[in-house]
């Protein structure tokens, strides 16, 4: 009798384990069935880059593509959306996720949820060669009301600037990063602000000796980005995190992001739990 009871107990444990191991979120089931995930990206190399044939590459979508493959989702379909419009797109479920260097910020965590960090890096300015206004911090911009800076609406850099005393009237928003660099070249603004590697990539492509890179920016924390999801996709976020951890453990993660200039080590000690209030 004891053997029968023990066998039955073991059977129940196995059934429970199987359910835990193989149960999938409704979101993942849907994505696997349709064969693709719709992903919001911004055209900001090296985070994300839209090729002339429409193919989307870059560190963030390449990581997402690899993670989705592990999860059994065959294709990533990208939708180009500016950073400021990504959260509304996620909330409205126009996209399944966003992956394009969208920094994990406490205020954003009130509207969306994030995966574990996949890309971390410093901030930068582009200025006229010689840095005539000696701009090394956002406080330097704030100290001179005559100065104008450019960045994108909804970007982390906009918030960094406003938090450090830059007036809203000093900010001129660009539509795309290259158009922001064009403003700087034309003298319409005094400084361009964006992620470090994004700014560096733009200046290398522009190849203008009259422009200079200032990196890192003092007084600004290292920014970390992760894949972003609708607030209700907690189970899918957990599945994504498990696959991302697997990708990191195999070394494939480093092989994907390091050619773009990012460091796999930089994400090692980071977690969305410490960057989002209440560990959302």
Feature map (PLM): residue ranges:
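A ligand-binding cleft/hinge motif common to bilobed small-molecule-binding domains
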Residues: 85, 101-110, 160-163, 190-221
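Short helix-initiation/N-cap motifs at beta->coil->alpha
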Residues: 76-88, 133-136, 172-186, 221-223
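Flexible hinge/capping segments at coil-to-helix
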Residues: 28-30, 128-148
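Ligand-binding cleft/hinge of the Venus flytrap
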Residues: 50-52, 64-74, 139, 154-175, ...
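Extracytoplasmic small-molecule ligand-binding "clamshell" domains
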Residues: 23-101, 110
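Hydrophobic/proline-rich hinge and linker segments of small-molecule sensing/allosteric domains
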Residues: 38-42, 114-137, 227-230
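Periplasmic-binding protein-like
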Residues: 120-124, 204-241, 263-280
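Ligand-binding clefts/hinges and TM-proximal coupling segments of bilobed small-molecule sensing domains
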Residues: 25, 156-172, 212, 244-280
């Amino acid at each position: 009798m004891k053997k029968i009871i023990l066998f039955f107990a073991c059977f129940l444990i196995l059934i429970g384990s199987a359910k835990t191991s193989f149960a999938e979120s409704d979101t993942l089931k849907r994505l696997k069935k349709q064969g693709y995930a719709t992903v919001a990206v911004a055209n900001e190399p090296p985070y994300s880059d839209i090729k002339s044939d429409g193919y989307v590459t870059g560190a963030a979508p390449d990581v997402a593509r690899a993670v989705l493959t592990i999860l059994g989702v065959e294709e990533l379909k990208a939708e180009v959306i500016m950073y400021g419009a990504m959260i509304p797109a996620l909330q409205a479920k126009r996209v399944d996720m966003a992956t394009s260097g969208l920094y994990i910020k406490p205020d954003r965590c009130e509207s969306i949820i994030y995966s574990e960090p996949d890309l971390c890096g410093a901030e930068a300015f582009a200025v006229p060669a010689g840095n005539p206004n000696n701009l090394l911090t956002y406080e330097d911009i704030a100290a001179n009301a005559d100065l104008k800076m450019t960045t994108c609406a909804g970007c982390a850099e906009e918030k960094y600037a406003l938090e450090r005393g830059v007036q809203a009237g000093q900010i001129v928003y660009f539509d795309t990063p290259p158009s922001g660099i064009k403003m700087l070249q034309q003298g319409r603004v005094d400084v361009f602000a964006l992620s470090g590697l994004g700014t560096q990539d733009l200046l290398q492509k522009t190849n203008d000796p009259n422009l200079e890179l200032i990196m890192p920016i003092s007084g600004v924390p290292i920014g970390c980005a992760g894949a972003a999801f609708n607030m209700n996709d907690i189970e899918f976020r957990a599945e994504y995190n498990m696959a991302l951890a697997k990708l990191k453990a195999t070394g494939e993660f480093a092989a994907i992001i390091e050619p773009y200039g990012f460091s796999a080590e930089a994400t090692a000690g980071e977690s969305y739990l410490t960057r989002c209030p209440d560990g959302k």
